[in-house]
Protein backbone atom coordinates (compact mmCIF):
# COMPACT_ATOMS: atom_id res chain seq x y z
CA UNK A 1 0.00 0.00 0.00
CA UNK A 2 1.44 3.35 -1.04
CA UNK A 3 1.66 5.91 1.76
CA UNK A 4 -0.04 9.21 1.07
CA UNK A 5 2.11 12.30 0.87
CA UNK A 6 1.64 14.96 3.54
CA UNK A 7 -0.15 18.10 2.38
CA UNK A 8 0.93 21.53 3.56
CA UNK A 9 -1.07 24.70 3.11
CA UNK A 10 0.71 27.55 1.37
CA UNK A 11 -0.10 30.74 -0.46
CA UNK A 12 -0.26 30.82 -4.23
CA UNK A 13 -0.71 34.58 -4.36
CA UNK A 14 1.08 37.07 -2.09
CA UNK A 15 2.53 40.60 -2.31
CA UNK A 16 5.91 40.73 -4.01
CA UNK A 17 7.87 41.38 -0.80
CA UNK A 18 6.54 38.16 0.77
CA UNK A 19 7.74 35.82 -1.95
CA UNK A 20 10.34 33.38 -0.65
CA UNK A 21 9.56 34.33 2.95
CA UNK A 22 6.19 32.74 3.80
CA UNK A 23 6.34 30.33 6.74
CA UNK A 24 5.42 27.21 4.77
CA UNK A 25 9.04 27.45 3.60
CA UNK A 26 10.09 26.07 6.99
CA UNK A 27 8.09 22.90 6.42
CA UNK A 28 9.20 22.51 2.81
CA UNK A 29 12.81 22.87 3.99
CA UNK A 30 12.45 20.15 6.62
CA UNK A 31 10.79 17.77 4.18
CA UNK A 32 13.52 18.41 1.63
CA UNK A 33 16.18 17.68 4.26
CA UNK A 34 14.38 14.43 5.07
CA UNK A 35 13.96 13.42 1.46
CA UNK A 36 10.18 13.25 1.88
CA UNK A 37 7.74 14.16 -0.88
CA UNK A 38 4.78 16.43 -0.16
CA UNK A 39 1.87 18.19 -1.80
CA UNK A 40 0.66 21.75 -1.39
CA UNK A 41 -2.81 23.14 -0.85
CA UNK A 42 -2.56 26.63 -2.31
CA UNK A 43 -4.54 29.57 -0.93
CA UNK A 44 -4.96 33.26 -1.71
CA UNK A 45 -3.35 35.55 0.88
CA UNK A 46 -5.61 38.44 -0.10
CA UNK A 47 -8.89 36.87 0.96
CA UNK A 48 -10.21 34.99 4.02
CA UNK A 49 -9.97 31.26 3.48
CA UNK A 50 -13.37 30.41 4.95
CA UNK A 51 -14.69 28.25 7.80
CA UNK A 52 -13.49 24.93 6.38
CA UNK A 53 -9.88 26.06 6.42
CA UNK A 54 -10.24 27.66 9.85
CA UNK A 55 -11.11 24.25 11.29
CA UNK A 56 -7.68 23.18 10.03
CA UNK A 57 -5.79 26.38 10.89
CA UNK A 58 -7.74 28.38 13.51
CA UNK A 59 -5.91 31.65 12.77
CA UNK A 60 -6.48 31.47 9.00
CA UNK A 61 -2.74 31.50 8.32
CA UNK A 62 -0.20 29.15 6.75
CA UNK A 63 1.21 26.63 7.16
CA UNK A 64 -1.01 23.83 8.30
CA UNK A 65 -0.29 20.20 7.51
CA UNK A 66 -2.40 17.11 6.94
CA UNK A 67 -0.60 13.77 7.17
CA UNK A 68 -3.05 10.91 6.87
CA UNK A 69 -5.47 11.32 9.77
CA UNK A 70 -3.25 13.87 11.52
CA UNK A 71 -3.91 17.60 11.13
CA UNK A 72 -1.49 20.10 12.66
CA UNK A 73 -1.02 23.86 12.54
CA UNK A 74 1.84 26.17 13.60
CA UNK A 75 5.22 25.73 11.96
CA UNK A 76 7.06 24.79 15.16
CA UNK A 77 4.58 22.03 15.97
CA UNK A 78 4.76 20.71 12.41
CA UNK A 79 8.56 20.65 12.48
CA UNK A 80 8.57 18.76 15.77
CA UNK A 81 5.99 16.28 14.47
CA UNK A 82 8.00 15.59 11.32
CA UNK A 83 11.28 15.22 13.21
CA UNK A 84 9.78 12.73 15.64
CA UNK A 85 7.89 10.79 12.98
CA UNK A 86 10.86 10.37 10.65
CA UNK A 87 13.52 10.32 13.39
CA UNK A 88 15.50 12.95 11.53
CA UNK A 89 16.62 16.51 12.28
CA UNK A 90 16.69 15.88 16.04
CA UNK A 91 19.83 14.62 17.82
CA UNK A 92 19.63 11.18 19.43
CA UNK A 93 21.46 12.09 22.65
CA UNK A 94 18.89 13.32 25.22
CA UNK A 95 20.76 16.51 26.18
CA UNK A 96 21.34 17.54 22.56
CA UNK A 97 17.79 16.57 21.62
CA UNK A 98 16.27 18.76 24.30
CA UNK A 99 18.64 21.58 23.45
CA UNK A 100 17.33 21.44 19.88
CA UNK A 101 13.73 21.50 21.10
CA UNK A 102 14.51 24.36 23.49
CA UNK A 103 16.07 26.36 20.65
CA UNK A 104 13.06 25.62 18.47
CA UNK A 105 10.87 27.31 21.07
CA UNK A 106 13.44 30.06 21.67
CA UNK A 107 13.36 30.98 18.00
CA UNK A 108 9.58 31.24 18.09
CA UNK A 109 9.17 32.91 21.48
CA UNK A 110 12.34 34.91 22.16
CA UNK A 111 13.68 35.93 18.75
CA UNK A 112 10.88 36.00 16.18
CA UNK A 113 8.66 38.53 18.02
CA UNK A 114 11.59 40.95 18.32
CA UNK A 115 12.21 40.83 14.57
CA UNK A 116 8.57 40.71 13.53
CA UNK A 117 7.60 43.92 15.29
CA UNK A 118 10.30 45.72 13.31
CA UNK A 119 9.07 44.17 10.07
CA UNK A 120 5.50 45.18 10.88
CA UNK A 121 6.46 48.80 11.48
CA UNK A 122 8.94 49.10 8.60
CA UNK A 123 7.08 47.17 5.89
CA UNK A 124 3.39 47.37 6.68
CA UNK A 125 3.40 50.88 8.18
CA UNK A 126 6.46 52.36 6.51
CA UNK A 127 4.57 55.44 5.33
CA UNK A 128 3.22 56.29 8.77
CA UNK A 129 4.70 59.26 10.63
CA UNK A 130 5.54 57.08 13.62
CA UNK A 131 7.21 54.23 11.71
CA UNK A 132 10.85 55.36 11.72
CA UNK A 133 10.78 56.25 15.39
CA UNK A 134 9.16 52.96 16.30
CA UNK A 135 11.74 50.97 14.36
CA UNK A 136 14.60 52.79 16.08
CA UNK A 137 13.01 52.16 19.46
CA UNK A 138 12.61 48.45 18.72
CA UNK A 139 16.11 47.85 17.36
CA UNK A 140 18.06 47.55 20.64
CA UNK A 141 15.86 44.75 21.96
CA UNK A 142 16.16 42.78 18.71
CA UNK A 143 19.92 43.35 18.65
CA UNK A 144 20.21 42.11 22.22
CA UNK A 145 18.27 38.93 21.40
CA UNK A 146 20.44 38.24 18.37
CA UNK A 147 23.59 38.84 20.40
CA UNK A 148 22.41 36.17 22.86
CA UNK A 149 21.92 33.70 20.02
CA UNK A 150 25.38 34.47 18.66
CA UNK A 151 26.96 33.97 22.08
CA UNK A 152 25.19 30.65 22.55
CA UNK A 153 26.19 29.47 19.08
CA UNK A 154 29.81 30.41 19.61
CA UNK A 155 32.11 28.29 17.46
CA UNK A 156 29.49 25.62 16.75
CA UNK A 157 28.09 25.24 13.27
CA UNK A 158 24.58 24.52 14.57
CA UNK A 159 22.62 25.29 17.71
CA UNK A 160 22.42 21.74 19.07
CA UNK A 161 25.66 20.42 17.62
CA UNK A 162 24.21 18.82 14.51
CA UNK A 163 21.81 20.45 12.06
CA UNK A 164 18.25 20.21 13.37
CA UNK A 165 14.76 21.64 13.19
CA UNK A 166 16.00 24.36 15.56
CA UNK A 167 18.31 25.64 12.84
CA UNK A 168 15.55 25.53 10.23
CA UNK A 169 13.40 27.71 12.47
CA UNK A 170 16.13 30.08 13.62
CA UNK A 171 17.69 30.60 10.19
CA UNK A 172 14.29 31.13 8.58
CA UNK A 173 13.74 34.13 10.85
CA UNK A 174 16.58 35.93 9.10
CA UNK A 175 14.59 35.93 5.86
CA UNK A 176 12.37 38.56 7.49
CA UNK A 177 15.20 40.46 9.18
CA UNK A 178 14.49 43.57 7.11
CA UNK A 179 17.27 45.61 8.75
CA UNK A 180 19.72 42.68 8.48
CA UNK A 181 20.47 42.97 12.19
CA UNK A 182 21.71 39.38 12.30
CA UNK A 183 24.55 40.35 9.98
CA UNK A 184 25.86 42.70 12.67
CA UNK A 185 26.97 39.55 14.49
CA UNK A 186 29.74 37.81 12.49
CA UNK A 187 28.80 34.48 14.04
CA UNK A 188 25.20 34.82 12.85
CA UNK A 189 26.20 36.13 9.44
CA UNK A 190 28.24 32.95 8.89
CA UNK A 191 25.48 30.79 10.41
CA UNK A 192 22.90 32.31 8.08
CA UNK A 193 25.14 31.70 5.06
CA UNK A 194 25.72 28.04 6.05
CA UNK A 195 22.01 27.45 6.44
CA UNK A 196 20.97 29.08 3.18
CA UNK A 197 23.71 27.30 1.23
CA UNK A 198 22.18 23.93 2.07
CA UNK A 199 20.75 22.27 -1.06
CA UNK A 200 17.53 21.38 0.77
CA UNK A 201 16.89 25.05 1.57
CA UNK A 202 17.50 26.05 -2.01
CA UNK A 203 15.13 23.36 -3.30
CA UNK A 204 12.47 24.39 -0.78
CA UNK A 205 12.67 28.05 -1.68
CA UNK A 206 12.59 27.29 -5.40
CA UNK A 207 9.48 25.15 -4.85
CA UNK A 208 7.77 27.94 -2.93
CA UNK A 209 8.63 30.50 -5.59
CA UNK A 210 7.30 28.18 -8.30
CA UNK A 211 3.91 28.02 -6.56
CA UNK A 212 3.37 31.79 -6.66
CA UNK A 213 1.22 33.28 -9.39
CA UNK A 214 0.36 36.97 -9.72
CA UNK A 215 1.32 39.35 -6.93
CA UNK A 216 -1.52 41.81 -7.39
CA UNK A 217 -4.85 41.49 -5.63
CA UNK A 218 -7.72 40.69 -7.97
Descriptions of predicted regions:
Residues 40, 91, 162, 204-205:
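A generic structural-conservation signal
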Residues 206-218:
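Terminal-tail/helix-coil boundary detector
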Residues 44, 165, 208:
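Short, solvent-exposed turn/loop segments enriched in Gly/Ser/Thr/Pro and often Arg
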Residues 83, 173-174, 205:
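Active-site-flanking alpha-helical
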Residues 1-133, 140:
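GST-like domain detector, emphasizing the conserved glutathione-binding G-site
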Residues 107-197:
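GST-like fold's C-terminal all-alpha helical module
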Amino acid sequence: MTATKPTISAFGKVPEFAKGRVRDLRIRWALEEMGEEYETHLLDAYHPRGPEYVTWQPFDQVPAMRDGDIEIFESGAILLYLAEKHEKLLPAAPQDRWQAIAWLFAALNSVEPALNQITTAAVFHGEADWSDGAVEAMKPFAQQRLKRVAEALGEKDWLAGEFSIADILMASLFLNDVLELANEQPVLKAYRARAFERPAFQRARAAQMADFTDSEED
